[in-house]
Amino acid sequence: MQHVKELSAKLKEKKGFALKMLIGLDGFVDEIIHPVDKRQDYKTFTRIKTIGEFGERITKAAGLSTNIEMVTIQTKLGGNGPILSNALLEYGVKLTYVGALGTPDIHPVFHPMTEKAAAVYSLCNPGLTDAYEFEDGKLIMGKHSSLSSLTWEVCKKGMGGAEGIAKMVGECHLFGMENWTMLPHMSDIWQGIIDEVFPLLPATAEKPLAFFDLADPEKRTKEDIRRAMGLIGKFEQKFRTILGLNEKEVYEIAEVLGITISDSSTDKLKDTVVAVHKAMGIYCLMVHPVRTVCCAIGDEYFFTEGPYCAKPKLTTGAGDNLNAGFCLGLALNLDPLSAITLGACTSGYYVRNAKSPTFDQAIAFAEDWDAGKV
């Protein structure tokens, strides 16, 4: 693909960039878990490979009972905001993080991230996640009670009031507040920013970017989702607003917004993305199915195949890494097709190596992808 071939050259021209970003608000301690199928001895086991197999195991236990062993493969930082931030920091962004990293002390899993960050504001304790990994996807089991203490008043108190927040936001190229679904007061926080921070923001020749990721809104009511979409739209007053979704989410948002796309459409994904983007009135809607990435900006639609990995080392966080690459691309003023391609490279590297790439590693990955080596 020509745009993959061209990406590495475009990135080389951007080396040595200086970007500031402010990201929040969640934080999770993730345990990456493999459910056991058969155990050969106390060290060796075969895992349950697919979600379907796992579902069959559970279904067979109905009316009876069963015991499924879970093996923790890794304990790591989690949450959309921290994983997104970790990837951006690896790229060399000067980043401030605000969120649920632990109080009074930051949880040790976040220390590598916070040591690289320009500044950190930890406002409450993190949530906990059990991530059951399979070859065809993952099941995320979350414990979120600690996040209910993260309110607009707590944000203001921890960040120097509306004036302190405005100063931080006003100095950034990109501002992001992630994981609306799991933060029960996020809509109120957004409303507080609109009401109290927007009037304090300086006028700029070009509006900075604002990035939002809902994180699977299925469990929230349609009224909640509709309100959140309206608030995200209002950020367009001060920002070039980006909403990042996966394929499942974009169809859910379309339904909430009353958008119906016929199943007979020759490209249902494109038609849905374009319609949701237009309905929301925002700068950009980016959607990442498992094997592809696309976005709508202005009146244009952009699409790329991705470097699909059949047997990933790690999938939890793949979407956040894609978001990081895409956001970095737009912040570097890459064209939209190059930005989604950088997102695909970032995610592609991450699932193969279980870590985020550096800028040089992303360039090398793009070259390998173009050469058919990934």
Regions found by a protein language model. Give the residues of each.
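Ribokinase/PfkB-type carbohydrate-kinase core domain
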Residues: 1-64, 71-80, 90-301, 353-374
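Conserved post-catalytic alpha-helical subdomain immediately downstream of the catalytic base
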Residues: 284, 307-373
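Alpha-helix C-terminal capping segments
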Residues: 85-94, 328-333
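Glycine/serine-rich anion-binding loops at beta->alpha junctions
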Residues: 74-87, 313-321
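A structural signal for well-ordered alpha-helical segments within the folded catalytic domains
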Residues: 79-82, 86, 248, 324, ...
